[in-house]
Amino acid sequence: MATTSIAGPRLTSLKTAAGKLGYREICHVRQWAPVHSPMPHFGMLRCGSRRPFATSSSTVVQAQAQATAAEQSTGEEEAVPKVESPVVVVTGASRGIGKAIALSLGKAGCKVLVNYARSAKEAEQVSKQIEAYGGQAITFGGDVSKEADVDAMMKTAVDAWGTIDVVVNNAGITRDTLLIRMKKSQWDEVIDLNLTGVFLCTQAATKIMMKKRKGRIINIASVVGLIGNIGQANYAAAKAGVIGFSKTAAREGASRNINVNVVCPGFIASDMTAKLGEDMEKKILGTIPLGRYGQPEDVAGLVEFLALSPAASYITGQAFTIDGGIAI
């Protein structure tokens, strides 16, 4: 298998066996051809009875006709094309929750575009893990708060795989400080990436999904968007905005069979929580009824259900908390 590398937001072109794909972002593309096992042919039919039976010419003709029909039926079944793997775009997928989501969907058989802003090496490792599962992945560097980057990202997925079935908007940052000390630049940074980025990605994906009258969008917000948190006025505002925005997007997309839902994590184990002192951790865990941190895989499991399960086809416009009970 050959791997073709392309570079970040200054692109060149991507060569594949099918030809050339041109775009302006840098990415790394890997594709594993799925293994197709043809259905086995049935051999001669055997009668389970040992009793002798008479055979007439009409019976022989009838049996031959049935055998021919069975062979044709088997051939038709073999000719049925394999269901295509869903194409998924996951933003902020180089680490933490985004990484867990990308790996979960890749393991489930999806073709995954792994978006990152600065962590190219980590994103590349995520793609390699997806490939190890037998999947396909594109690693794409881009800032989701910039419209040109978002358009190039969506084009990359469509050029590589023909469509986009699922988008998971996970990219986000924090710039924590008390409200009275918060600089406008700290406010703007968080709103631009955490809210405007979701708007741009959802808008771009919806245009593609509306044409095929099908799609699923999962936006990662936070329990902070529901209950607030000291020192996170900017973050809480952005995540509350994501929830309201997603409900409107769900109403507008419903007529085209586009489901839009929100996942609101609470305290999830991360590099940051690992560095907290014992006293701080004790205080945090005291606010969680289940008394422990969630794991990135907990969030990924819920996202996978909303993204892929037929049982989630009638769910839209909902905000799901996965927080150990903080928002009860």
From Swiss-Prot:
EC number(s) recorded for this UniProt protein: 1.1.1.100
UniProt keyword list: Chloroplast, Fatty acid biosynthesis, Fatty acid metabolism, Lipid biosynthesis, Lipid metabolism, NADP, Oxidoreductase, Plastid, Transit peptide
Gene Ontology terms for molecular function: 3-oxoacyl-[acyl-carrier-protein] reductase (NADPH) activity; NAD binding
Targeting signal (transit peptide) range: 1-66
Record bears the keyword Cytoplasm: no
Residues holding NADP(+): 90-114
Gene Ontology terms: cellular component: chloroplast
Enzyme class: oxidoreductase
Subcellular location(s) per record: Plastid, Chloroplast; Plastid
Pathway annotation from the record: Lipid metabolism; fatty acid biosynthesis
Gene Ontology biological-process entries: fatty acid biosynthetic process
InterPro entries hit by this protein: 3oxo_ACP_reduc, NAD(P)-bd_dom_sf, Sc_DH/Rdtase_CS, SDR, SDR_fam
Catalytic activities: a (3R)-hydroxyacyl-[ACP] + NADP(+) = a 3-oxoacyl-[ACP] + NADPH + H(+)
Sites where the protein binds substrate: 222
UniProt-annotated catalytic positions: 235 (proton acceptor)
Family assignment from sequence similarity: Belongs to the short-chain dehydrogenases/reductases (SDR) family.
NCBIfam families linked to this entry: 3oxo_ACP_reduc, PRK07231.1, PRK12826.1-2
Complex formation: Homotetramer.
The name this protein goes by in its record: 3-oxoacyl-[acyl-carrier-protein] reductase 2, chloroplastic
UniProt organism field: Brassica napus
Name of the gene this protein is made from: bkr2
